[in-house]
Amino acid sequence: MKRRQRLTARSRLRAGIRCHNRFYNAMVQDLASAKRNGVYGERLAPLFSELVPAETLKTALGVSLAFEVNLGQRRPDCVCTVQFGKGSDAKGVCILIELKTCRFSKNMNTASKNLQRKGGMRPVHDSCRLLARTLPPGSGEIVLAPVLVFVAQRGMRVLRVTRLSPQVVYSNAAVLSCTISRLAEYAPPVSAKSTRRRCVAKGTKAKAFSTKAAAEPVPSITPAQPSAAAAVVSLFPAAVPANTTNAAAVHQPVAVSHVNPLAWAASLFSPK
């Protein structure tokens, strides 16, 4: 009986890890699609659309998306940083996402899911606190927005989004983005779809051929390899994540500014 319970726990753990990895890859693809088309997909809409209109993706200066970010005591599943201007005084938004996977998604108020929710609030709050303590110097206002996300193992659907109280800090958005990217310990695997390339040989006509990219995942490493994080950062020249309402302000974050973070973020996109 005990052996069967251990095997069940291991299988659940492996299923959760696979779900995390698939969701990371889906986020990369969905953000790229939203950047091109100016429309959020069903997966990103609950996370991004409440604060940032899809059209704003085309006007933001840059975005970085990093996974399994090693902050020492905590390791948030995903950190998305957005830069709205140039220089050390540029404003930005930094979303720290903690993922919880669900095998069954019909009832989100079960005892196990409530336990998952309570267990996920502390890590994402701690991640925000740790990041706020180690910010690079700068005068730009940056909103730190911790978010807890429930994802269905089948279909990668976002089932519930719980937001803790955001806080405003001062830092350099560009340097912060690079710092977080260097701390990333995971990069989504390269797609295995065949790509068409043209090889032009000297004195001959151009010939087309297909090559298949190797779909080997990047292993977790400590410290993180800069190349793994850089591969994720370079995917998007511009995109904006959402910093939405306070759905679950369990912990009072360290106040760095008396400005209402949500009012400030909303003012970024108000007509002038």
Swiss-Prot record:
It comes from the Viruses. Keywords: Host G2/M cell cycle arrest by virus, Host-virus interaction, Modulation of host cell cycle by virus. Pfam families: Herpes_UL24. One of its GO terms (biological process) is symbiont-mediated arrest of host cell cycle during G2/M transition. InterPro entries: Herpes_UL24. Belongs to the herpesviridae UL24 family. This is Protein UL24 homolog. The gene is UL24.
